[in-house]
Amino acid sequence: MPHARTRNPSPIPEVTWDTGLKEMNETWKGAIACLGVAVFFVMTIGIIYWQVVDQPNKNWILKGTFSGVIWERRSHSLLIQTLAEEKTFVEIGVGELGTPDGDAPFVRNLCWSNKTEFCYTWDAVVELKISAEWPDAPDTECYRLSWSPLRCQVDLQDCFSMANVSWYGGAALRAQSWPINAANTTMQPFTVSNLREQPAGYGSVLERYFLGSTGVAVLVDPEVPLHVGFDSRQQFCLRTPASAEQQPLQYTLCVGRNAKSVHQEVGRQLSAHKRTLPNLDILRLPFWKLPVNVDSAVKLERELRTFSNRLKRHHLGEGVIALNEHSTSLLADTDHDSLYGKKERKRQARDLSLIKLLNISVTLSPFLSINSRQFLASLQEGTEEYWLSLSAALRGRPIPLLTQWKGNFCVKLNISNPAAVSWFLDKVGALHARLGMEYVILEGGEGSPVEEQALQPQRALSSDAYIPLLAGVAARIGDAAILTSGTRSSHVPLFLRMNQLQDDWSYSGLKGIIPSVLHYSLLGYNFFIPDAVGGSLLGEFVTDPELFIRWLEIVSFLPVMVFQTPPWLCGDDKVVNLTRAYLALHQEFIVPLIVKYAEEWRTSQSPIYRPLWWISPEDPVTFTIDDEFLIGDEVLVAPVTERGTVHRDIYLPGSTLQWQDRSNGRVFDGGTLLENYAVDLETVAVFVQRPS
């Protein structure tokens, strides 16, 4: 029977619902997928736009109470600014550090849980940690920066901009400038060099401390193997060179209201030792370098008596006759008597007793000629460890290192060896018993034969560790010792002899005196002996009376007056008379001032010799003045440093102060520029602050 189909009563035609739903789902899925791709594409474009275009160029990465650290991503630099961003203390260029993309972000703090720290690992090359610190002073705050390489052979370098900042401190230079913005030196180890041998190096006085006029101070850790370079008027850079030891670059950066306030706080960290005054009797006696170079003790003794008599004949007062190292060795020679017969020995003994009646200074160094009897005896007696040496692998005995000192092959005292130090002190004691000298000048602390020969030094004698140790030896000699180099030793109560200068008007000569005075004083070395009048670098007499007089005028306001050219050999009686006058001025006016402010330095650490910005730390005019200085806050000295001129511009700091010309009594308001002020050849412009 045929099957009868049931009729559909509904007006809607029959459809297969499963198939239709499946097709609908596929359509919606495709639309959603397209929409997702579109959204993802838009988000990607947005992120790229934010990263490249819309992301702020500056990002705060750490904030203190009134200042903070900003990352400037396009220039790859750190900015230290006030929180209101109205003042930039310093800009630090950090370089690429392995990041090829100069626009790479640098805002992810890995120390996010600690609000006083910022940490970041840069391309697995170096790790940066910045910690905020707060000293006792309420208007000073510090940031501790530590760059740590994460692999070997990574150069670390931070460069400090000189734009709108005058920088001070660091190291003495052959041509000293104040501020140091004009310096131009290649990147080199930041150690004290002998500027006579290495005129492009760093010399005499050096500290890992830099002060900026905006109120910023940088103090580099003493353990860092530091290299420093100056790019004139652009920047100076701190660097730790690539090595297998993965040495970090670490320093503390402090900011304050101005340069004076931050220096008063941070400058204390230059030396944690108690401040003690040296023997100030040295202020009262000029030093006269014996102007002869003889080859025998007999001739030397004759010249000593003759020179002493000439000083008396010209009424130049009592002074100290200074002997160089060669002359000292002639008088110290223990074979001196054996060169003569019995009659001559008696005369020599009589002459030495006359020498003891003179005020003399001798010059010694930690160097010993390899041709000397003492050195040969040390080899025979097995005391080679008295000298800086290398250990011999086979025989176990040290091998002394050769170096050069004043044209001779020498060895250098191993100052970390107590037996060697005792031997040296015995040598000084014997010399004092023989000559009765007033002062001992100790040269030769700078340089290291170990590092000069690219050898691995003992840690105790690496870099500038030798100089503080030598200062300790000098202190054991007594307060009659005088040093010629200083680093990390400003607390030692001894005088320091300054760099030798050229006999000209340049910054390597007369113009460099005041910048050097301000540099030494800022770093804590207030008790210094300037170079001889007219300069002593070339060892020749000054033949220009004008140069001699202008030089004389400057040094008469410094702690000790030193002469190499006798005034009677430079010009006529006028030069001798002026020398007498300025010796008297030094005794009657300057020495009491130095004694007064020496006590202030001991208690407050304020320098004796001060830049003009010490009185006006907010006055930008004072930041670059390098031919005026203050003694304390009460005396301003403005010498003439240009050849052939009897006028100069003089700036008087302190808008609320008044200054009186010491020579004519005229009174001027502070904050005033005296243009074309008359200063005769025989005079120095000196102003005394009037009490308010």
What are these regions (language model features)?
Residues 1-28:
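Short, low-complexity, Lys/Arg-enriched N-terminal segments of secretory-pathway carbohydrate enzymes
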Residues 18-29, 457, 509, 618:
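Juxtamembrane membrane-interface segments at transmembrane-helix boundaries in membrane proteins
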Residues 32-49:
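Hydrophobic membrane-insertion alpha-helices, especially the h-region
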Residues 52-282, 291, 297, 308-310, ...:
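Catalytic and substrate-binding clefts that recognize carbohydrates or anionic sugar/phosphate headgroups
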Residues 74-79, 93, 473-481, 486-500, ...:
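Catalytic core of carbohydrate-active enzymes
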Residues 218-221, 227-230, 262, 331, ...:
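Short helix/loop capping segments that flank catalytic or ligand/cofactor-binding pockets
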Residues 315-583, 615-617:
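Aromatic- and carboxylate-enriched substrate-binding clefts and catalytic-loop regions
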